[in-house]
Amino acid sequence: PNASFSTIVDNEEIMMTMNTIASQKKLEAAVWLDLNNGMNRTGIIPDKEAALLYQKIALSSNLKAKGLHVYDGHIHASDFAVRKEICDRDFDLVLGLKKQIEQLGIQIKTIVAGGTPTFPIHVKRDQVEVCPGTPLLWDQGYADAYKDLKFIPAAVLIGAVVSKPAKNLMCLNLGHKAVAAEMPPPRLKILNFEKLEQISHSEEHIVVACVDSKNYIIG
């Protein structure tokens, strides 16, 4: 009962449809304006058009303008100083839009911003709620790339050797069903056996190269 729901929008036509539906349901829908400050996946460019769209949200009958939302997942420099420089530069576009909107007489109380590598930067800003790109569990790639975030292991996958198809090869049952395939190999860290080279990855299996597979027991 204490939960509140909101959504994002970056298009005037969709915004108007949302307002119509909310009116029909006799509801007030909470809406954030989604911005594109470099990610180029969703969001509206933070310019005059975006300011006018936010104004229309604020003036609509059944929508409540909550603020600005920006996901900057395109910023992934490993070096913190470089990452912060890019993050600050791209966030200046958001602050510029905030100023434009406030010049229209509309106050922006909150900006929701962040991505996994940038949330430590945004958390120090005033009037910004942090929204990490990955909110709960990160994969080993983040720990390797962002030493400053000091991730610690929170979960471990258990796999077994299911076959030894050749002298220097082993097949484990840690395929796509267990480990996401979106990133290039290596996709997982094999604890205590980091030198095992990951050769191929399919739906149910991962094949690794080893010095001598006879040292490993199937099962």
Model-derived regions: residue spans:
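Active-site-proximal beta-alpha core segment in soluble small-molecule metabolic enzymes
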Residues: P1-F80
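Active-site anion/phosphate-binding pocket segments in diverse small-molecule metabolic enzymes
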Residues: V82-G219
